[in-house]
Amino acid sequence: AKKTILDLKD
């Protein structure tokens, strides 16, 4: 889990 837009996919 990252605090970036990647979090949307997480």
UniProtKB/Swiss-Prot annotation:
GO terms for biological process: xylan catabolic process. Keywords: Carbohydrate metabolism, Glycosidase, Hydrolase, Polysaccharide degradation, Xylan degradation. Pathway: Glycan degradation; xylan degradation. Its EC number is 3.2.1.8. One of its GO terms (molecular function) is endo-1,4-beta-xylanase activity. It catalyses: Endohydrolysis of (1->4)-beta-D-xylosidic linkages in xylans. Belongs to the glycosyl hydrolase 10 (cellulase F) family. This is Endo-1,4-beta-xylanase B. The lineage of its organism: Bacteria, Pseudomonadati, Dictyoglomota, Dictyoglomia, Dictyoglomales.
